[in-house]
């Protein structure tokens, strides 16, 4: 039986992080968590490309464009959508999630979904380094695991 596990990545990788500026109190913490996890995994600073976009709606397009450049091995998309008093929250959540899923499924490299969608700012902050952990950090760790699995899958040929 062959078993493929998310082992530590054995080749140099370059990672893109696309981060939304909107709700930057949260997204800067998500970004810091992702960068810290990548550095702890041995990814040098020069192999991390950070791209800032206005908000969650811009994440899918820029993530897809970045994934097509051929200069990175994987992308982490980070954002925070906090529910307000209108339906705008619902549409932003649906469209950013669908767009990032499409970029991941049809694009050339893996895309990690790190967009918080919360009922209030406290929930968002709890998931950006508070008692709920740091979802940016978790996305970085997940990306490295997926890259490892994909490397092992390519070696099956």
Swiss-Prot record:
Active-site residues from the entry: 88
EC number(s) given by UniProt: 2.5.1.78
Signal peptide extent: none
GO molecular function (one): 6,7-dimethyl-8-ribityllumazine synthase activity
Binding site for 5-amino-6-(D-ribitylamino)uracil: 22, 56-58, 80-82, 113
SUPFAM superfamilies to which the protein is assigned, alphabetical: Lumazine synthase
Top-level division of the source organism's lineage: Bacteria
Catalytic activity field: (2S)-2-hydroxy-3-oxobutyl phosphate + 5-amino-6-(D-ribitylamino)uracil = 6,7-dimethyl-8-(1-D-ribityl)lumazine + phosphate + 2 H2O + H(+)
GO aspect biological process, one term: riboflavin biosynthetic process
Pfam families linked: DMRL_synthase (PF00885)
GO CC annotation: cytosol; riboflavin synthase complex
Chain sites annotated for binding (2S)-2-hydroxy-3-oxobutyl phosphate: 85-86, 127
UniProt keyword terms in alphabetical order: Riboflavin biosynthesis, Transferase
Covalent S-S links between cysteines: none
Database matches in InterPro entries: LS (IPR034964), LS/RS (IPR002180), LS/RS_sf (IPR036467)
Protein task: Catalyzes the formation of 6,7-dimethyl-8-ribityllumazine by condensation of 5-amino-6-(D-ribitylamino)uracil with 3,4-dihydroxy-2-butanone 4-phosphate. This is the penultimate step in the biosynthesis of riboflavin.
Entry similarity comment: Belongs to the DMRL synthase family.
Protein's name according to its UniProt entry: 6,7-dimethyl-8-ribityllumazine synthase
Species per Swiss-Prot/TrEMBL record: Levilactobacillus brevis (strain ATCC 367 / BCRC 12310 / CIP 105137 / JCM 1170 / LMG 11437 / NCIMB 947 / NCTC 947)
Highest classification ranks of the organism: Bacteria, Bacillati, Bacillota, Bacilli, Lactobacillales
């Amino acid at each position: 039986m062959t078993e493929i596990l998310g082992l530590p990545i054995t080749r140099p990788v370059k990672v893109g992080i696309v981060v939304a500026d909107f709700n930057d109190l949260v997204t800067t913490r998500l970004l810091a968590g992702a960068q810290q996890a990548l550095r702890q995994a041995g990814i040098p600073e020069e192999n991390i490309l950070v791209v800032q976009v206005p908000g969650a709606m811009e994440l899918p397009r820029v993530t897809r464009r970045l994934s097509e450049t051929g200069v990175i091995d994987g992308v982490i998309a980070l954002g925070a959508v906090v529910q307000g008093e209108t339906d705008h929250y619902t549409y932003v959540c649906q469209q950013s999630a669908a767009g990032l899923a499409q970029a991941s499924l049809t694009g050339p490299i893996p895309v990690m979904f790190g967009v918080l969608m919360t009922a209030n700012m406290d929930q968002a902050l709890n998931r950006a380094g508070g008692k709920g952990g740091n979802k940016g950090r978790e996305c970085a760790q997940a990306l490295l695991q997926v890259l490892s699995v994909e490397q092992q899958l390519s070696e099956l040929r």
